[in-house]
């Protein structure tokens, strides 16, 4: 297995961060869109246009609650040269595939008092489709205020799992 691609992002605005992300992960983002096109063609009676419409229905809520994330999403789409609709499908795939839903992930913590080294361990597995593995990236983001974030996600998705 290859190492995951690391995307380094440092910009002053969420849109500029998104553009950098989209440009650096363009091929993986486009491959991810194709993974979901094939997946939904096999598992859904809905057309790709209908699936895009479903994903886009989340846009008003995202704009109201997290406008900076939406700004970044537009940047990712522009940087990867894909439509915002395709990017929204990537980011809403959980919601789109929710019913019927099979379990995906397990999260656990081991507290210091339970270990001989008095160390805290955080564990998370990601039980999902093998087809997405080649499109997983590590994001290393440095925000304008100096906040640094490191995380793992499917290319094109806003950060999934991470630390800051």
Regions found by a protein language model. Give the residues of each.
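N-terminal mature-domain region immediately after signal-peptide cleavage
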Residues: 1-164
């Amino acid at each position: 297995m290859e190492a995951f691609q690391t995307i380094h992002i440092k910009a002053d605005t969420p849109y500029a961060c998104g553009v950098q992300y989209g440009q650096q992960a363009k091929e993986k983002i486009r491959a991810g869109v194709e993974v979901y096109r094939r997946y939904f063609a096999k598992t859904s009676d809905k057309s790709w246009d209908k699936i895009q419409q479903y994903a886009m229905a989340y846009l008003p809520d995202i704009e109201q609650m997290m406008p900076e994330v939406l700004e970044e999403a537009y940047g990712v789409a522009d940087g990867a040269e894909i439509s915002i609709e395709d990017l929204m499908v990537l980011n809403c795939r959980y919601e789109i595939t929710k019913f019927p839903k099979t379990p995906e992930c397990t999260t656990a913590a081991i507290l210091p008092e339970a270990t001989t080294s008095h160390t805290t361990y955080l564990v998370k597995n990601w039980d999902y489709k093998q087809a997405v593995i080649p499109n997983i990236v590590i994001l290393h983001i440095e925000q304008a205020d100096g906040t640094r974030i490191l995380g793992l996600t499917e290319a094109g998705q806003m950060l999934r799992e991470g630390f800051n």
